């Protein structure tokens, strides 16, 4: 939940939203091209203009947020006063016959209507299982260097004002109950590092929450509350989604509980690098259903009320571009978190780039490195003591195949490695100094992220 943790948390105030914004600095293009299958959190470097330039905002109003959301300029009130016309409850045309009592007529008119569309049905069946998650932690504050100046200390003497060295960060997100004994799926960036987690149900009840585990690499976490006979969601199948089908988001944006928005699935399989978070091991669902800070961890539903994704992030300064983790991926990670409290991701230990003639020329000019090919996947760095280093992979090697399957770009390699298990042995076909070679690599476990 650190502001720069693998997935930072978006605070209440818009000007404090953490963002992934990439400049159009040509001097660093070759670094952005690198795709990492090796380290936990490679630094995002300037790149060519892409969707990520707009800035990715994680939609948990996470720890670090402060202040109160206040509605101002209530123009609706003036509109109601000046422009609204209040119609009579019963018009002349609708007066009941003499032999029918007025009370009976009014009662029939005021009776609740049946749900008029599938969204109403979905909200009624799933809404009670969507929760608000409040998290907080105590962090140490750094004293401004000026207050350590000996001159100031001599000047103020004993009247030097004490500086608080701790402060409480608070944040809000959403989640959904997946078991009637209180297991809840949410985003890792909502609860990472929290000292205290509180879960509030739609019926108003609140429970302390325990984080069973979180995985920053996929931004999935599981929270447990001690309660029974709870409403639950139905989990769908995100492997067979169709672009254009309905999408319904339920959550607590900006502290507004139980907010429902609708849209469609705009795209599937959005690669993490395409949206500005190359360290994430997820291919995202894109939707135009309105998602805002506080929606993080809430469900994205299909027309049948099944959860197909976990709402996670939006593109800042853009309309109708939100992203969700496919529920199949979230469920896979959550099962490991429930069982062991952690997740092991396959780790090769290289940084690589999809080569192009332009990039080949730029690398040669800026680094002096002579890349022998102008296409394919080139290893730019081998991490010390990594599985790749042990297998004798070298900088400048060109990856041609993995387990006999030809590879054409870095994203394909990353996807294939992500499907492997720790301990698997894989054969890599490489081109080195114009000679083809085959090397066998034993897949390791992705190292944990260092403290932020």
From Swiss-Prot:
It is found in: Cell outer membrane. GO terms for cellular component: cell outer membrane. InterPro entries: HhoA_HhoB_HtrA-like, PDZ, PDZ_sf, Peptidase_S1_PA, Peptidase_S1_PA_chymotrypsin, Peptidase_S1C. It comes from the Bacteria. GO terms for molecular function: serine-type endopeptidase activity. Induction: No induction by UV-B light. Disruption phenotype: No effect in a single knockout, but growth is inhibited at high light (120 umol photons/m(2)/s) or at elevated temperature in a triple protease knockout mutant (hhoA, hhoB and htrA). Triple mutants are not phototactic. No effect on the PSII repair cycle, even in the triple protease knockout strain. Pfam families: PDZ_2, Trypsin_2. GO terms for biological process: proteolysis. Keywords: Cell outer membrane, Hydrolase, Membrane, Protease, Transmembrane, Transmembrane helix. A putative protease, its function overlaps that of the related putative proteases HhoA and HhoB. Belongs to the peptidase S1C family. This is Putative serine protease HtrA. It comes from Synechocystis sp. (strain ATCC 27184 / PCC 6803 / Kazusa). The lineage of its organism: Bacteria, Bacillati, Cyanobacteriota, Cyanophyceae, Synechococcales.
């Amino acid at each position: 939940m650190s502001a720069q943790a693998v997935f930072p948390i978006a605070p209440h105030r818009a000007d404090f939203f953490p963002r992934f914004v990439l400049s159009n600095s040509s001097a660093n293009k070759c670094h952005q091209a690198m795709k990492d299958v090796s380290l936990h959190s490679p630094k995002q470097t300037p790149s060519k203009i892409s969707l990520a330039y707009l800035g990715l905002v994680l939609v948990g109003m996470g720890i670090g947020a402060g202040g109160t959301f206040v509605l101002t300029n209530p123009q609706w009130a003036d509109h109601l006063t000046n422009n609204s016309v209040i119609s009579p409850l019963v018009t002349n045309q609708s007066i009941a016959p003499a032999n029918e009592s007025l009370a009976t007529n009014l009662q029939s008119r005021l009776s609740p209507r049946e749900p008029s569309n599938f969204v109403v049905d979905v909200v009624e069946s799933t809404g009670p299982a969507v929760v608000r998650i409040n998290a907080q932690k105590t962090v140490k504050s750094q004293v401004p260097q000026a207050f350590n100046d000996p001159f100031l200390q001599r000047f103020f003497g004993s009247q030097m004002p004490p500086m608080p060295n701790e402060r409480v960060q608070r944040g809000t997100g959403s989640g959904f109950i997946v078991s009637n004994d209180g297991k809840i799926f949410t985003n890792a960036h909502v609860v990472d590092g929290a000292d205290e987690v509180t879960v509030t149900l739609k019926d108003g009840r609140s429970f302390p929450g325990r984080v069973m585990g979180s995985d920053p690499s996929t931004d999935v976490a599981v929270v447990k509350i001690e309660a029974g006979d709870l409403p639950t969601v139905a989990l769908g199948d995100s492997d067979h989604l169709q672009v254009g089908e309905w999408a319904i988001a339920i959550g607590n944006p900006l502290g507004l509980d139980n907010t429902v928005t609708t849209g469609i699935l705009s795209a599937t399989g959005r690669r993490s690098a395409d949206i500005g978070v190359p360290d994430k091991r997820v291919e995202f669902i894109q939707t135009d259903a309105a998602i805002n800070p506080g929606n993080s961890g809430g469900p994205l539903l299909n027309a049948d009320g099944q959860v197909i994704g976990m709402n996670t992030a939006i593109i800042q300064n853009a309309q109708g571009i939100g992203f969700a983790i496919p529920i199949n991926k979230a469920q896979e990670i959550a099962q490991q978190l429930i069982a062991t409290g952690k997740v092991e991701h396959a780790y090769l230990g290289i940084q690589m780039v999809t080569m192009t003639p332009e990039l080949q020329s730029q690398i040669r000019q800026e680094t002096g490195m002579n890349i022998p090919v102008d296409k394919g996947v080139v290893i730019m760095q081998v991490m010390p003591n990594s599985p790749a280093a042990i297998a004798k992979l070298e900088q400048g090697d060109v990856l041609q195949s993995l387990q006999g399957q030809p590879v054409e770009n870095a994203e394909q390699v990353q996807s294939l490695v992500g499907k492997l298990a720790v301990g698997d042995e894989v054969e890599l076909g490489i081109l080195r100094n114009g000679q083809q070679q085959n090397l066998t690599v034993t897949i390791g476990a992705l190292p944990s992220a260092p403290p932020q």
